[in-house]
């Protein structure tokens, strides 16, 4: 795995995690 795919994996993980937090927050979790 090169640094480019590793970086993209990190970005997508953080984006998904933050998006999930926003959804949970709006649902009152």
UniProtKB/Swiss-Prot annotation:
<dbReference type="GO" id="GO:0045158">
    <property type="term" value="F:electron transporter, transferring electrons within cytochrome b6/f complex of photosystem II activity"/>
</dbReference>
<comment type="subunit">
    <text>The 4 large subunits of the cytochrome b6-f complex are cytochrome b6, subunit IV (17 kDa polypeptide, PetD), cytochrome f and the Rieske protein, while the 4 small subunits are PetG, PetL, PetM and PetN. The complex functions as a dimer.</text>
</comment>
<keyword id="KW-0602">Photosynthesis</keyword>
<dbReference type="GO" id="GO:0017004">
    <property type="term" value="P:cytochrome complex assembly"/>
</dbReference>
<comment type="similarity">
    <text>Belongs to the PetN family.</text>
</comment>
<keyword id="KW-0812">Transmembrane</keyword>
<keyword id="KW-1133">Transmembrane helix</keyword>
<keyword id="KW-0249">Electron transport</keyword>
<feature type="transmembrane region" description="Helical">
    <location>
        <begin position="3"/>
        <end position="23"/>
    </location>
</feature>
<dbReference type="GO" id="GO:0009512">
    <property type="term" value="C:cytochrome b6f complex"/>
</dbReference>
<protein>
    <recommendedName>
        <fullName>Cytochrome b6-f complex subunit 8</fullName>
    </recommendedName>
</protein>
<keyword id="KW-0934">Plastid</keyword>
<dbReference type="GO" id="GO:0009535">
    <property type="term" value="C:chloroplast thylakoid membrane"/>
</dbReference>
<keyword id="KW-0813">Transport</keyword>
<keyword id="KW-0472">Membrane</keyword>
<keyword id="KW-0793">Thylakoid</keyword>
<dbReference type="Pfam" id="PF03742">
    <property type="entry name" value="PetN"/>
</dbReference>
<keyword id="KW-0150">Chloroplast</keyword>
<dbReference type="InterPro" id="IPR036143">
    <property type="entry name" value="Cytochr_b6-f_cplx_su8_sf"/>
</dbReference>
<dbReference type="GO" id="GO:0015979">
    <property type="term" value="P:photosynthesis"/>
</dbReference>
<dbReference type="InterPro" id="IPR005497">
    <property type="entry name" value="Cytochrome_b6-f_cplx_su8"/>
</dbReference>
<comment type="function">
    <text>Component of the cytochrome b6-f complex, which mediates electron transfer between photosystem II (PSII) and photosystem I (PSI), cyclic electron flow around PSI, and state transitions.</text>
</comment>
